[in-house]
Amino acid sequence: MKIMVAMSGGVDSTMTAKFLQEAGHEVQGCYMMLHQKPGYHEENIRKVKKVGEYLGIKVHILDLQDKFNEYVYDPFVRLYKEGKTPNPCALCNKFIKLGALLDFAKVNGCEKLATGHYVQVVDGFITCAKDPSKDQSYFLAQVPKEVLKDVIFPLGDKFKKDIKELARGVKVLEEFATQAESSEICFVENTYIEVLNKHYNTNLPGNVVDKDGNIIGRHQGYMHYTIGKRRGFEVFGAHEPHFVIKINAEKNEIVVGTKDDLAQKVVELENVNLFIDEDKFECETKIRYRSPKLEAFVEVDKSSKTAKLTLNQNALGVAQGQLCVMYDGDRVIASGFIKN
């Protein structure tokens, strides 16, 4: 089978290509240029070409910067401007890695696209990886169901520690096996504020208000804050912790309250991606990547791709713009971006 492998120059994508070649497939590699972080691509392309030479496979260099800006970077900047908390990796997987790259693979005669994500596809459903510490099902939950028949994830049934150990046994991969893992947003060097500062003045002080609109303090600029944050702003004469419970971008205002004020049981979603036919169902849900799963009842409006999620217990720090993913056991059955 002809398979295109998304290659980054890291251990996971390199071992993905190696596993598939050893299984007898005709493998091609593709490195995607997605952003303009200085010096980033040169080193990665060097690594990808080195692996390509070792494996004897063709390596494509694909410039997707325009698409990346349109579907990932620009929305990232815009959502922070609107006082929301974006999830760029979910958009990148949907529109770029399993969107534009899949199209490129097909144009080049490949039957499948493979990536180094730690996730499985079982019976047409995105399913949690065998290694729970590396599971990326959350970030792939916006990928359309019809795409899943064309993609494979060879690392989904493996443990990361085993992958790194295997990589140490291959001479050309030795420098990759010991390199630090990248876990942050690829186009963010240090903090997201540095990215936003290229487009806006984020340091515009404003008022901190309570739930009733009373001015009780000052902040350094609303884009510095996300829902649930409790530091970096001043509350006059405060003796107990205050948490950001709402961001009013138009007024350059943040609303603060107690931890109890952060609690939320009803969540509204938009851009819902549904993997099942039902429009009413019970599930377990994650309101952000690192949050525990909470039981919920979901009502979906398929025509508008919106949903109402009623949790069985309070969730803390529900942030507009973040991805909410719904599970049935280990299977992803729906996802949507938090609207309210």
Curated annotation (Swiss-Prot):
**Top-level division of the source organism's lineage:** Bacteria
One Pfam annotation reads tRNA_Me_trans_C
> Can you say where in the cell this protein is located?
Cytoplasm
- Which named protein is this? tRNA-specific 2-thiouridylase MnmA
Gene Ontology cellular-component terms listed? cytoplasm
SUPFAM superfamilies cross-referenced by the UniProt entry: Adenine nucleotide alpha hydrolases-like
Q: Which residues form the active site?
A: C92 (nucleophile), C186 (cysteine persulfide intermediate)
Chain positions covered by the region annotation Interaction with tRNA: 134-136, 288-289
Q: Name one GO biological process term.
A: tRNA wobble position uridine thiolation
